[in-house]
Amino acid sequence: MAPLTAAEVSSLLAELGPHAETQEKKEALGVSAYRALFGAKPEYINLFSKLQGLTIDNVFIKYYGGTLVTTRNVNKQQFLSGEPIFVDFFKKMQKLLHHIFPIAGIHAL
């Protein structure tokens, strides 16, 4: 997979800019991404230590919305299976996510 060009990175950052201007907007963006993930894969909720015992109906994900990319106790297959959900959510960021997920998956358990 070819890395993103500087122009593509600049374009993505410009597009995301209005959605990440404040901590509140960053959290809202992250919460939306996690709602998409947990809606499609509710079994993933319990892979997050602070969400043990919760369901899609009562999960509180604001904390995770603000920390979208951190180390998680999941294996490589579990991590990589979330890729299509995030790609769907971030349709305009598809090329970036296809580039990042395999690299990040190397660091998964």
From Swiss-Prot:
Stated family: Belongs to the globin family.
InterPro entries with a match to the protein in the record: Globin (IPR000971), Globin-like_sf (IPR009050), Globin/Proto (IPR012292)
Disulfide-bonded cysteines: none
Keyword Heme in record: yes
Note: This globin lacks one of the heme-binding histidine residues found in most other globins (replaced by a tyrosine) but has a high oxygen affinity despite this change.
Name under which the protein is recorded: Globin
Physiological role: Oxygen binding protein.
Source organism of the structure: Dicrocoelium dendriticum (Small liver fluke)
Keywords: Heme, Iron, Metal-binding, Oxygen transport, Transport
Chain ranges of the Globin domain: 3-109
Source species, domain of life: Eukaryota
